[in-house]
Amino acid sequence: MRKKIEIFTDGSCFGNPGPGGYGAILRYKKYEKEHSAGFLLTTNNRMELMAAIIALEFLRDPCEAIVYIDSKYVHQGVIQWIYNWKKHNWKNSAKKIIKNLDLWQRLDVVSNLHVIHWRWVKSHTGHPENERCDELARIAAEHPKFEDIGYKR
């Protein structure tokens, strides 16, 4: 039987592109882990993707996860667009390689290890975990330490 995990994520970016960060909370029963990191030059969409990726990569065993995200870009991507992108060799309807390909492929790989229920939440509406992830992401963006190698490609 798979462990049931709750994951909350958010991304932030100043300038878009500019310094950015992500925040994530992983919850299993009464245990909770927070994680965040900041990047020198990135975009908001990349940080939203990174939050989900890193949170899922923390899971050591296959789990059943409910992932709460406030990014419509990520939510639409994982529940709708990714199937056609993969079918068309990661190209969009204009036959161009999709943006953030490196992260979408990474999310696809890690997502296939788990049973995931994606849930969109409206940002800045008092959802406590989303507000905390937003805070973690903003603080990380204010103190960036890492280079987003994929953004520079």
From Swiss-Prot:
One of its GO terms (biological process) is DNA replication, removal of RNA primer. Binds 1 Mg(2+) ion per subunit. May bind a second metal ion at a regulatory site, or after substrate binding. It is found in: Cytoplasm. It catalyses: Endonucleolytic cleavage to 5'-phosphomonoester. Monomer. Belongs to the RNase H family. Endonuclease that specifically degrades the RNA of RNA-DNA hybrids. This is Ribonuclease H. It comes from Baumannia cicadellinicola subsp. Homalodisca coagulata. The gene is rnhA.
